[in-house]
Amino acid sequence: LKPVCGCSRLEEVDVRSMKRKALARQMAYMSQGAIPPSGFVVEDLVAFGRMPHQGLLRQWRREDEDAVEKALTQCNLCELRYREIDTLSGGQRQRAWFAMAMAQDTPVLMLDEPTTFLDIGAQIELLEMAVDLNRTQNRTIALVLHDMNLAARYSDWIIAMKAGEIV
């Protein structure tokens, strides 16, 4: 989306002026209801989060492996690492997407309705992981939630919107 006025800045830099790969090293994005390619297993999806750290001269390294392993462990996905994404429950699938964003290893995570289609237990589990990531690794987490009770419980700051306007 292009802003009607103003700009979005990250570390004093307009994000529109940043190259995609540079932005992806600073900010991970988890969209709502994302659909992985058919046949992807959990570990492959999580490893996809390391793409911004790859390049022509920099291929897969030990730190990439460590980031994937850490994300799988923190999201309780180690036992599911070889399962195809489309065989997982909704909560497991959301944890896999969250693990991919974690493996990207950025200072900022943007989560667009990460609790969509999840039962309350899975919602709380995912939000607890986000809070833990914020508190233990000092990562900024910005998320969109429609449940004001969850927003109040898990957020330090809340911006309420109605019809596309901040209220």
How should these model regions be labeled?
Residues 6-14, 23:
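Conserved ABC transporter NBD signature motif
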Residues 47, 62-80:
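Conserved ABC ATPase "signature" region
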Residues 59, 84-88:
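Conserved ABC ATPase signature
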Residues 109-113:
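Catalytic Walker B motif of ABC-type/P-loop ATPase nucleotide-binding domains
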Residues 124-137:
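Helical segment within the ABC ATPase nucleotide-binding domain
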Residues 145-146:
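H-loop/switch region of ABC-family ATPase nucleotide-binding domains
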Residues 158-167:
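H-loop (His-switch) and adjacent beta-strand-loop-beta switch element
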